[in-house]
């Protein structure tokens, strides 16, 4: 499998998250995905939706709340931000882009690419360990990762010109008694970068070319990856998976 850049999103938040897991399973080289999502809230694998969102509002307004396979905190998706994903097969090695074991090492590797891509767009950013990319104005991207014996996924959401007030209101639980068992999102000042999506994509391609010595060309999910996405879609569309308690065995892990 050659390195590839996947730019098209799937149809809707559940399908996009299903495709993320399908690519994690199927990728054996380097795949970078830059994609948008509908207005939605994406929660971490060990979170409880009602602790991380204004769930009543989301349900009332038809805003999907979808659990991802990676850990970490809740994020707002919608107009004004772009998601980036890095998939690396276990045997892939090219400069700083390589399979590493350990969440902090993965975050450092991924942040190196995103920070350099942001710099190429005129934005000074850096890694605030363990998993936040920040500028002088505030946090512009978080990161979450999943490691397996065959490969890894690290992804995040980069703020471009998002509605920060809506993002904050949708990821603020309303009148809920909290429980310490669940991973909680950490409040931090956030900021937009003002980067254009096309400029970010071009800059990412430039950084990858510097690291690998080759241009990363636009590609598509394979037939087997698309089939895996279709097979996974019922899970990511299931309220039990998305809204259920991750510690009570109701959501298949």
PLM feature spans:
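Active-site loop/lid in soluble adenylation, ligation, and acyl-transfer enzymes
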Residues: 1-52, 56, 68, 170, ...
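Catalytic beta-strand/loop module used to bind and position nucleotide/cofactor moieties
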Residues: 61, 79-210, 228-253
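Glycine-rich anion/phosphate-binding loops
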Residues: 63-65
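Histidine-centered catalytic/metal-coordination loop motif
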Residues: 68, 78-79
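Glycine-rich phosphate/pyrophosphate-binding loop regions near the starts of catalytic domains
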Residues: 75
């Amino acid at each position: 499998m050659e390195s590839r850049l996947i730019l098209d999103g799937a149809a809707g938040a559940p399908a996009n998250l299903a495709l993320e897991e399908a690519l994690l399973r199927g990728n054996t080289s380097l795949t970078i995905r830059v994609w948008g999502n509908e207005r939605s809230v994406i929660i971490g694998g060990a979170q409880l939706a009602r602790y991380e969102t204004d769930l009543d509002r989301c349900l009332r307004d038809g805003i999907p709340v979808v659990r991802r396979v990676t850990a970490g905190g809740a994020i707002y998706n919608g107009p004004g931000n772009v998601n980036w994903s890095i998939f690396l097969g276990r045997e892939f090695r090219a400069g700083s882009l390589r399979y590493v074991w350990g969440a902090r090492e993965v975050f450092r590797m991924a942040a190196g690419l995103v920070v350099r891509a942001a710099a190429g767009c005129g934005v000074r950013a850096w890694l605030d360990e363990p998993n936040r990319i920040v500028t002088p104005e505030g946090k512009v991207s978080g990161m979450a990762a999943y490691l397996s014996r065959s490969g890894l996924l690290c992804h995040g959401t980069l703020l471009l010109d998002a509605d920060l007030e809506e993002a904050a209101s949708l990821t603020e639980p309303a009148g809920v008694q909290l429980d310490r068992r669940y991973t909680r999102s950490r409040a931090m000042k956030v900021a937009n970068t003002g980067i254009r999506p096309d400029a970010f994509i071009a800059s990412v391609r430039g950084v990858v070319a510097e690291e690998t010595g080759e241009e990363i060309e636009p590609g598509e999910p394979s037939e087997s990856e698309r089939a895996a996405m279709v097979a996974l879609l019922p899970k990511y569309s299931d309220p039990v998976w998305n809204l259920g308690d991750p510690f009570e065995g109701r959501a298949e892990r």
